[in-house]
């Protein structure tokens, strides 16, 4: 029952306390969902989400399966996201329908769709957490190519961790690109775990 972390959003007036047990359950079930979509050790995922608990679930689920993930800042325009899609060739993009800042809404899913169209590489899956925010609800009936994050998590079985070498790539972090195109810096699992 110990609290793992507290999600506190003054913009949406939401406070959520997540225990270590809840975190482990959500992460292992979401990992099972990713496995059911065909993802496995050595694959790559892009996580393009606001700072919500589901982003942490996605990152940890990828790590649990040996899927190298790249978290892309939600403030980036579709063109910047497309550059990262082409560079790391993800099998899946994990996103949210929208994000909120103090005085504006960030349309994550429309940005992902635009980046998808721009990119030469086409990820096999787009998993969307529907935040059900004003004007940015997901039209699941008319967009069958999208996978519902919450349904995937709820219907999936928990899976165990996949063993990886200490040198296995954990995540890719892109440089700012001040002197040209952003470059992906790969952090390995062992180095990150011991840092």
Show which residues each predicted segment covers.
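Conserved pre-ATP/AMP-binding loop-to-beta segment of ANL
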Residues: 3, 126-129, 140-174, 181, ...
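Structural core segment of the AMP-binding/adenylate-forming
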Residues: 64-151
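Solvent-exposed alpha-helix faces
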Residues: 28-32, 86, 180
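N-lobe entry segment of adenylate-forming
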Residues: 1-18, 25, 29, 116, ...
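Short, intrinsically disordered, charge-balanced linker/junction segments flanking boundaries
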Residues: 188-195
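Conserved S/T- and glycine-rich ATP-binding loop of Class I adenylate-forming
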Residues: 45, 62, 169, 175-178
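Conserved AMP-binding/adenylate-forming core of the ANL superfamily
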Residues: 4-59, 145-151, 190
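Short acidic loop-to-helix transition motifs that present clustered carboxylates
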Residues: 54-55, 75-80, 193
């Amino acid at each position: 029952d110990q609290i793992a972390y507290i999600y506190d959003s003054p913009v949406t007036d939401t406070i959520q306390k997540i225990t270590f047990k809840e975190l482990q359950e959500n992460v292992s079930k979401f990992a099972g969902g990713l496995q059911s979509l065909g993802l496995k050790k050595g694959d790559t995922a892009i996580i393009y989400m606001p700072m919500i608990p589901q982003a942490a679930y996605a990152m940890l689920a990828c790590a649990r399966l040996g899927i190298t993930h790249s978290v892309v800042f939600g403030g980036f325009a579709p063109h910047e996201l497309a550059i990262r899609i082409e560079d790391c060739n993800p099998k899946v993009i994990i996103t949210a329908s929208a994000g909120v800042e103090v005085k504006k809404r960030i349309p994550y899913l429309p940005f992902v769709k635009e980046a998808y169209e721009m990119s030469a590489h086409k990820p096999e899956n787009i998993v969307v957490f529907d935040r059900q925010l004003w004007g940015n609800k997901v039209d699941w009936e008319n967009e069958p190519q999208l996978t519902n994050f919450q349904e995937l998590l709820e219907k999936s079985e928990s899976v165990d961790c996949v063993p990886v070498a200490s040198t296995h790539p954990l995540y890719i972090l892109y440089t700012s690109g001040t002197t040209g195109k952003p470059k992906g810096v790969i952090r390995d699992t062992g180095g990150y775990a011991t840092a």
